[in-house]
Amino acid sequence: MVTVKFKYKGEEKEVDTSKIKKVWRVGKMISFTYDEGGGKTGRGAVSEKDAPKELLQMLEKQKK
């Protein structure tokens, strides 16, 4: 399992790619939503160059 490390509101976070629900591109950033548990949805973003290949593959799959 691959984890994505990112900063959100100044806080370092990481999330497993299996929890990511939706992925989209905003300029040179890859944004995503993920399941935080307890019915909560979290948001995050990572630069395209720092994104793991699994996250980029998820982005390509959602485009189709």
Swiss-Prot record:
Annotated localization: Cytoplasm
Which keywords does this chain's UniProt record carry?
A: Cytoplasm, DNA-binding, Methylation
Origin superkingdom: Archaea
A matching Pfam family: 7kD_DNA_binding
Summary of temperature dependence: Hyperthermostable.
Keyword Cytoplasm assigned: yes
N6-methyllysine: modified positions:
5, 7
How is this protein's function tied to pH? Highly stable from pH 0 to pH 12.
One Gene Ontology cellular component term attached to this UniProt record is: cytoplasm
A GO molecular function for this record?
Answer: DNA binding
User: Predominant location of this chain?
Assistant: cytoplasm
- PTM annotation: Lys-5 and Lys-7 may be methylated.
Q: What does this protein do?
A: Can constrain negative DNA supercoils. May be involved in maintaining the integrity of the genome at high temperature.
The record's section on NCBIfam families has:
Sul7d
Q: Hey, which family's this protein in?
A: Belongs to the 7 kDa DNA-binding/endoribonuclease P2 family.
The subunit field of the Swiss-Prot or TrEMBL record says: Monomer.
The protein here is known as DNA-binding protein 7b
Which gene specifies this protein's sequence? ssh7b
